[in-house]
Amino acid sequence: MLGYLLAGIAIGPWGLGFISDVDEILHFSELGVVFLMFIIGLELNPSKLWQLRRSIFGVGAAQVLLSAALLAGLLMLTDFAWQAAVVGGIGFAMSSTAMALQLMREKGMNRSESGQLGFSVLLFQDLAVIPALALVPLLAGSADEHFDWMKIGMKVLEFVGMLIGGRYLLRPVFRFIAASGVREVFTAATLLLVLGSALFMDALGLSMALGTFIAGVLLAESEYRHELETAIDPFKGLLLGLFFISVGMSLNLGVLYTHLLWVVISVVVLVAVKILVLYLLARLYGVRSSERMQFAGVLSQGGEFAFVLFSTASSQRLFQGDQMAPLLMKLVDKWLSRQFNGPEEEDEKPWVNDDKPQVIVVGFGRFGQVIGRLLMANKMRITVLERDISAVNLMRKYGYKVYYGDATQVDLLRSAGAEAAESIVITCNEPEDTMKLVEICQQHFPHLHILARARGRVEAHELLQAGVTQFSRETFSSALELGRKTLVTLGMHPHQAQRAQLHFRRLDMRMLRELIPMHADTVQISRAREARRELEEIFQREMQQERRQLDGWDEFE
């Protein structure tokens, strides 16, 4: 992040001067925050969001109100009127959503208690944008002229309509798109959803990031969650980087030079007040002592919402001259993160208990369903990936957590939890997909135990050559079992038939391994015939030897 900021300063008006129209770039680059909030929304379904209500409306509200009150009081000690001080206090109480979320991700705070609390505070700050903007014309004494209650009521109705429409329309629309099987169309639809929800909220005069966050939450429990995240992630990273570069370009180093002492004092006071409030709230909430300062430091910088609020206040003539220079608050970012972010804790509490699957099952057809049901019955945490949308819809009707997506995409595996999982079970129908997945897992997720489905001996050879020893030939075991039952019907003792089955399995596996070097050789067919004769001879010899021995089961008949 610091690199992006320095790059922005270097190419901006106060650096080499390559870019002069910073405002246009800054407005466009805000889409990075919009995409980031959509992905954050995908990670929180409504039930989990409801579980955070205490921290959102408790700690979040307390942080905004206490910080705003203290900062407004300090501003009133200077030459600010009380109305301007209130607006200034609210603006400075906010934190930078983009910077704070990025810092929390870099430091691994997302799955800790402090990260959960930090996200709750940021979410409440986004919600507080609406009443804060509505407060400005009231403080300016122009409510009658500029505060149209009818218009506000219509915006509320439109907002509710968006929630209801999104709740009942998004999944059917994406189901129709996924049925086409064209990945590019799915990506285009995802971009349309994110940009459309952002522009709709912007038209209502609300936060674009809040709109995309809500869209993400509405789709968090859908079968398309991981595929949506994979489709949007490259755009999020690119635009978020542009956002930080544009912030660096917009820094007014001239104000810093002419008002250096005032800037330093302002930054120190702002940081000190917010750290004090955040630290006390973290202590009251019960956050571990080792995480309190980290939590307070990450959220103690100024936020981009101050630009919007202060420009609105200036248009209402609450501010005069150059009383405010909110852009300067961006300078505290990386210094604070280095000062207050200690080493990551090994005993961090998980944010979402089921967010780290033990097993990823790829493919949920007839073969994969048996494996999945067995794992679920034994309380294993699994994530199932399936690219047949009809199968996904059917399985979700019966309560299975199956997600739509092509598992041969590395980003999809990563978002599905491959980095935290212990094993992956590959049950693809196509051998090419199976081998491609094996290669991807060995290259990008070498810690995973790979278990695979082999349709026949050819696939079994390929898996063994690739180093996969845990596999199952789909017809082999069932055919052996039926063969054992056939031997019993022909008069063989059940125990003897069981022994015959085990012998055959062991000898066949040995022959399978011996044939690996000649798997692609032209003499494979003749060698297979020879091996089959050897197998019959060995099998017959061992079975005759067993018949000579006194069988323990026969003794008690």
From Swiss-Prot:
Quaternary structure note: Interacts with the regulatory subunit KefG.
Gene this chain is encoded by: kefB
Function: Pore-forming subunit of a potassium efflux system that confers protection against electrophiles. Catalyzes K(+)/H(+) antiport.
Domain RCK N-terminal: 356-475
Classification via HAMAP family: K_H_efflux_KefB
Topology versus the membrane: Multi-pass membrane protein
SUPFAM superfamilies assigned: NAD(P)-binding Rossmann-fold domains (SSF51735)
Keyword Cell inner membrane recorded: yes
Stated family: Belongs to the monovalent cation:proton antiporter 2 (CPA2) transporter (TC 2.A.37) family. KefB subfamily.
A GO term from the CC aspect: plasma membrane
InterPro entries given in the database record: Cation/H_exchanger_TM (IPR006153), K/H_exchanger (IPR004771), K_H_efflux_KefB (IPR020884), K_uptake_TrkA (IPR006036), Na+/solute_symporter_sf (IPR038770), NAD(P)-bd_dom_sf (IPR036291), RCK_N (IPR003148)
MF term (GO), any: glutathione-regulated potassium exporter activity
Compartments it resides in: Cell inner membrane
Gene3D superfamilies attached to this UniProt entry: 1.20.1530.20, NAD(P)-binding Rossmann-like Domain
Protein name, UniProt field: Putative glutathione-regulated potassium-efflux system protein KefB
Residue intervals passing through the bilayer: 2-22, 24-44, 56-76, 84-104, 121-141, 146-166, 176-196, 199-219, 237-257, 260-280
Keywords noted in UniProt: Antiport, Cell inner membrane, Cell membrane, Ion transport, Membrane, Potassium, Potassium transport, Transmembrane, Transmembrane helix, Transport
BP GO annotations: proton transmembrane transport
Superkingdom, taxonomy of origin: Bacteria
